[in-house]
């Protein structure tokens, strides 16, 4: 998917009332050789709030910044959170391309359903993503093996400790210029078939992209790395 021209995007975003606050101070951009994976972040982020009875509201693009959460927020205690991951690339013709981003937002909603999180408007999410990338376009690296990693995610923000679905959430999108996920680049990786520590069982949350699934994989991954494997 090509990123649409900025005038068209701005018109559509304006009709959806996404507020835009541009960063007054731009960050220095890292060299392509130092990128690694997920260490650096662009100048802006997208935020959308949810309140029970009001729905999703106040979509906005703002300068990248820390967020403030109550220590009792449900995301910390019960892991009610979902996320996605996709990339944007620059072609030799200087076009910005996305690969089936609508499928990522569709999958995000499937994860939402499993974690009792309200469904997001996939068209709004896609338009917000396009606008965010347009604003931070200069952050997309063009060296071989590099790209702009896109991380959409939702967190439960209610600040009480009963085990129940939250009534408030935040949906955010952040961007990170990246190199290869593995130190060896695009070369083959050594994979261990883990038989003791698992992240998915029948009836569980394995089909959802939720933080707890990845936390449960860390032990097996740690042991595999110690034995010289790259992944489990």
Residue ranges of model-derived segments:
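Residues in intrinsically disordered, low-complexity segments of regulatory proteins
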Residues: 9-10, 55, 138
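Non-catalytic, conformational "gating/processing" segments within enzyme and secreted inhibitor domains
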Residues: 135-136, 143-148, 152-165
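Helix-start/capping segments and mature chain N-termini
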Residues: 15-128, 132, 161-232
């Amino acid at each position: 998917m090509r990123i649409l021209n900025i005038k068209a995007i701005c018109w559509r975003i304006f009709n959806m009332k996404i507020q835009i606050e541009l960063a007054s101070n731009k960050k220095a951009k890292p060299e392509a050789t130092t990128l690694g994976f997920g260490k650096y972040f662009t100048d802006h982020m997208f935020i959308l709030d949810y309140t029970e009875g009001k729905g999703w509201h106040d979509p906005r693009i703002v300068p990248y910044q820390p967020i403030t959460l109550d220590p009792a927020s449900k995301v910390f205690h019960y892991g009610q959170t979902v996320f996605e991951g996709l990339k944007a690339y620059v072609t030799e013709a200087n076009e910005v391309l996305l690969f089936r981003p609508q499928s990522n937002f569709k999958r995000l909603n499937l994860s939402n359903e499993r974690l009792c999180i309200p469904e997001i408007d996939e068209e709004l999410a896609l338009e917000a993503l396009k606008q965010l990338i347009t604003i931070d376009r200069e952050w997309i690296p063009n060296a071989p093996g590099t790209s702009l990693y896109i991380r959409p995610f939702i967190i439960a923000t209610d600040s009480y400790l009963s085990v129940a679905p939250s009534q408030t959430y935040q949906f955010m999108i952040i961007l990170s210029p990246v190199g290869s996920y593995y130190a060896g680049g695009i070369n083959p990786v050594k994979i261990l078939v883990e038989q003791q520590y698992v992240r998915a069982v029948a009836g569980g949350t394995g089909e959802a992209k939720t933080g707890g699934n990845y936390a449960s994989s860390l032990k097996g991954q740690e042991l595999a790395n110690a034995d010289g494997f790259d992944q489990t």
